Amino acid sequence: MRITQGERESSGEFLMSREFYGVLIGVTTLLVIFLPKSLFLLVILFLCFAISREVSVALGENEVFYFSPLVLLTYYFADPLVFPLIGLLSLYFAYKRWELNSFFKSTFLLFYPALFLVYLIKIKEISTYYLLIFIFGIWINDVFAYYIGKNFGKTPLFPKISPKKTVEGFLGGVLFGSLFFALTLPYGILNSFLLGTFVLTVGVAGDYFKSFIKRQVGIKDFSNVFGEHGGFTDRFDALVFSAPVFYLIMCAGELNCKL
């Protein structure tokens, strides 16, 4: 069976499309969720390094990102040590440039994303099922927000930060994501729906925070490693911001978790 030129072009377009990268990210993430704890930790450390590197390059602090995985490990294994460590590292990088602005950037980069991503590990320690539910809920919100906003969106939510995101997309994403949480979390339908709404709203805030940084530094995406999805920071922003909130909710019903 011969493949026509048109079929080749169509196949090539799909491989570069948003849908292809979405499926690729989704399948890879599902495989990662079920990894043993030690391998899962390595993946989170890589994600921490990748996100920190993208944001560091965008902010012009190219040396700081090496230390972000170290901060994550320090907080995870010996949390009282993390804050003095962050302070010392921030002062070191500020001293090299002798700029207060550099101190604030360095401190931010050492906190972000390390002290957020560590909660993905903590969620998995409570239950792989909860981690699966959390990530699926974020995905459902993202997918419905994108397609509802694209097809029905008329009202910009925060046009100065992200003019393409709409009120309709936001409400649609949060509605369907919260319905998923309502059907899967063990807190009753109404409570689970409301908890899901709160978690997803925090995730949307993370998305806007990322957009704010991009607008400040004048870039469209933090990288193009995932094609139209952008970079690691663009793809996992909502997940990063909402992980601590979801973990705290899970802790409310568990006795074997710690902050």
Swiss-Prot record:
Main localization category: membrane
Catalytic activity entry: a 1,2-diacyl-sn-glycero-3-phosphate + CTP + H(+) = a CDP-1,2-diacyl-sn-glycerol + diphosphate
Bilayer-crossing regions: 31-51, 69-89, 103-123, 129-149, 170-190, 193-213, 236-256
Membrane topology: Multi-pass membrane protein
EC top class named in words: transferase
Record's subcellular location: Cell membrane
Pathway assignment: Phospholipid metabolism; CDP-diacylglycerol biosynthesis; CDP-diacylglycerol from sn-glycerol 3-phosphate: step 3/3
Gene Ontology CC terms, in alphabetical order: plasma membrane
Coiled-coil ranges from the UniProt annotation: none
GO biological process: CDP-diacylglycerol biosynthetic process
Keywords: Cell membrane, Lipid biosynthesis, Lipid metabolism, Membrane, Nucleotidyltransferase, Phospholipid biosynthesis, Phospholipid metabolism, Transferase, Transmembrane, Transmembrane helix
Keyword Lipoprotein: no
Gene Ontology MF terms: phosphatidate cytidylyltransferase activity
UniProt xrefs under InterPro entries: PC_trans
Enzyme Commission number(s) of this protein: 2.7.7.41
Domain of life: Bacteria
Record family assignment: Belongs to the CDS family.
Protein name per UniProt: Phosphatidate cytidylyltransferase
Source organism of the structure: Aquifex aeolicus (strain VF5)
GN (gene name): cdsA
